[in-house]
Structure formats: structure tokens, C-alpha cells
Amino acid sequence: MPGGRRGPSRQQLSRSALPSLQTLVGGGCGNGTGLRNRNGSAIGLPVPPITALITPGPVRHCQIPDLPVDGSLLFEFLFFIYLLVALFIQYINIYKTVWWYPYNHPASCTSLNFHLIDYHLAAFITVMLARRLVWALISEATKAGASSMIHYMVLISARLVLLTLCGWVLCWTLVNLFRSHSVLNLLFLGYPFGVYVPLCCFHQDSRAHLLLTDFPYAVQHQAVEESASTVGGLARSKDFLSLLLESLKEQFNNATPIPTHSCPLSPDLIRNEVECLKADFNHRIKEVLFNSLFSAYYVAFLPLCFVKSTQYYDMRWSCEHLIMVWINAFVMLTTQLLPSKYCDLLHKSAAHLGKWQKLEHGSYSNAPQHIWSENTIWPQGVLVRHSRCLYRAVGPYNVAVPSDVSHARFYFLFHRPLRLLNLLILIEGSVVFYQLYSLLRSEKWNHTLSMALILFCNYYVLFKLLRDRIVLGRAYSYPLNSYELKAN
């Protein structure tokens, strides 16, 4: 009727009175969102949070077989043999002769100039390279235990004799080197220890790698927080000498325990576990870097520092040998300190952590957005705001801090369980192919001998890497519901 009151149209009812599905899924009083009408005023309807509407699925982990890993004593013995072979090859590269020439030419009758070799330096290098093997022998003997008093006295006597012998050889070689060389050359003998002090002594957060996973939820949460605060307090209160002694003790201690994973339910526990694993991983990488550089320094670089100025040698080939020794030592130590079980542990923790992708301003303006909460487990595809930036959840299970770069880096490195193993295979395979190419093109006898000897050592390392890659590749490629799953 003209002049009568008109009711709201169907289009107005659909716009103002009914909440949209996006608002129901993305809204929440705690997240700072709510229902709004056409004019922009808020409607006081309670909206459930996103965790009540969308529950992330459980994180499922693959079961991997227990691959054989070399024991501490066996690995140190093989590593020591490899370093001795590399040291022998470097001495061949430096002191080789042309022994096949006729006698009417000024040549040597031996393959090496043995009279130019400093045997005190060779003995010093051998003892320094054997330090881990000696400590592994002492550790294994200590773990065996003593069944009687006589057995205990024999173990103590053997340890004292072994350590005394090593110390006497070091002192004897240092005294003779001090008599025949300048002080500048002697400084090269202890240079790696000067690098180790700032590299490892002032980073005591690695003590947090002992994860407390055998306790209930409340006890575990309290224990992790107390251990983190205790670690920080100890690192601040200890003096330089204590830090140095602890770092040197860890340098000789080969048996580093592998942490465990407990599939925690709380976001705080997940982040604390990631922090502990991150500190433990950084500690292991530092040990790998230092020991590989230490080995390459004493095997391939230190003999060059004590060569006489009148001695000619192939500088390019010696430097190439130095690089090869460092790469091979790095791969061998990484394989031992980061085994497949440890990489699977990091992968499981990264699956619980998740990742956030930073988006540009203005994008997804019509999509529901939430305020990030540290006590919420966010599902995949959710948009949150944190520190005035917009982020999107990438993983199916996300508890990471969006602005924390270390969390994103941890997820990138370990969310694929075979990434580290593939990288090691790529490095070692490239070295093997390059050495085969150099072996085919080599014309000098010392080049052929050095490549042939080093290749035998590299074949063993490459075989172990390829074996682990094939077995783990098949284990991770199986569908998750084809065997027993572990879900939190």
C-alpha cells in the first residue's frame, strides 16, 4: 500500500541478519573478531574459536628400521686409518722424487726424499690425530666395568700407561721441534685450539639437549622450563676456565646420547622440545666442523708449513688434497654424529612445529583473519596476524612463532626426512666422480697413487650413504595406514 511501512527485503536479510560461514569459521571473541551487520556495528553473538570448529588431524610418524651404525671405537679406528692414509699421501706429494731416472742423472734412488722429512713433526701429527681413538679406547674400557679388584687395577694401570705414553711423545716431539724450528712455525702447532675456544666454549646452550620425556605432562612442562633456566644460569655464572675444561672434555667424549621424542600435546612443550633439539643439533654441527677442519689442518696443511724454502712441491695438488680431506672428514663425521634415527627425530619434531608463510599487505582481505595465540594449535591454511604482519599456516600442525626465523629454518631443514641424507650423498658422490675423473687424467705417479688410495676410503662412505638412502626411501614412501602408526 502507498504510504505504508515496508519490511526488509530478502537481500537485506541475507546481508545483515545471517552470519556468513567465513565469519563462523574465522571469528572468535578471543581472537578479536565477531559478527557485524551491514552498518559495521558488532552483534553480540558468541562465536566459538577456530580450535572448536576445526581440529587439526593427529601427526602421524613413519616407522623406520634400525639401520646398523658403526660403534664409537670402530668409527674412530676407521677414521684414524683414513687420516693416516691421507697424511701419507700428503708426504708423497711433498717429498716425491724421480727415482726411475738413470744413474747418470742427478736423481734419487728412492721414491721419497726421506732425509728431508721431519719425523718429529710426523710423530706429533700422528698423536694429535689419534686423540679421539685413545679416548674411545679409554671410554670403552671404562664402560666394560671391573668384575674384580684385580681387573679394576688393570684398567686403571692401562689408562695411566696409555695417557702417559701419549703425553711423553707430545713433549718429546715439541722439545725437538723447538730446537730445530722458529717460534713462528711452532705457533702453527696449536692454532686449531685457539679457534676452538671462541667457537665452542662460549655457547653452553648445548647442555639443553637432554630432553625430559619420561615424565608426565605437568612434571615434564615444569622440568623443561627449570632446565632451560638452569642452563642459562650456569652459562652466565661459570668462569672461563670452567667453560674451557668442559668444552675440552666434550671434545674427547665421543658417545653423545641421542635425545628422544614424546609427541607432546602442549604447544609450549613442542616449542621447548624444538629449542632443545635445535641446541643439540647446533652443538653436533660445531663438533663436526671443528673436527673436520682440525683433521684437514694437521693432515694436509701443517706439513706444508714446515717445508724448507728450497723444497719444490705442487702447490695446487697439495691444496686440492687439503680440500678433499676436509670434505671427506666432514661427511664421515656428519654420518656418525647425525645418524638416521637422529634425523628422523628432528623430522618428527618439525612435523609438530609447523611453519608460517608471510603474506603481503592487502592480500586475502576478504578471508577471515585471527590474532595469533601461543596456546593454540593452528590448522593448515589459517590466516593469522602477528606483529602487524599477516601469515598463513603451511604445515598441517602449526605451533611455531610466526616471526621466529629459527622456527622457519628448523622446519625447512627437517620437514623432509631425507633432505640431509640427500645432501651428503650429493657431496660425496661429487667428490668420488671428480676423483675418478682426476684418476683417468693423471699422468704423474703420485697423483695416481693418491687418488687410488683415497677412493677406497670414499667408496665405503658412499656405500653406507646409498644403503641408508635406499632403505629409508622405501620406508618413508609406504602409505601411513599400511603399517602400525604412531599418532599423538
Swiss-Prot record:
Nucleotide-binding keyword on record: no
Record-level GO cellular component terms: endoplasmic reticulum membrane
UniProt xrefs under InterPro entries: Uncharacterised_TMEM39 (IPR019397)
Family matches, as Pfam families: Tmp39
Subcellular location: Endoplasmic reticulum membrane
Residues listed as glycosylation sites in the UniProt record: N31, N39
GO biological process, one term: autophagy
Keyword field: Autophagy, Endoplasmic reticulum, Glycoprotein, Membrane, Transmembrane, Transmembrane helix
Membrane topology: Multi-pass membrane protein
Residues annotated as transmembrane: 72-92, 110-130, 154-174, 182-202, 287-307, 319-339, 420-440, 446-466
Subunit structure: Interacts with SACM1L, SEC23A and SEC24A.
Cited function: Regulates autophagy by controlling the spatial distribution and levels of the intracellular phosphatidylinositol 4-phosphate (PtdIns(4)P) pools. Modulates (PtdIns(4)P) levels by regulating the ER-to-Golgi trafficking of the phosphatidylinositide phosphatase SACM1L.
Assigned protein family: Belongs to the TMEM39 family.
Name by which UniProt lists this protein: Transmembrane protein 39A
Upper classification of the organism: Eukaryota, Metazoa, Chordata, Craniata, Vertebrata
Recorded name of the encoding gene: TMEM39A
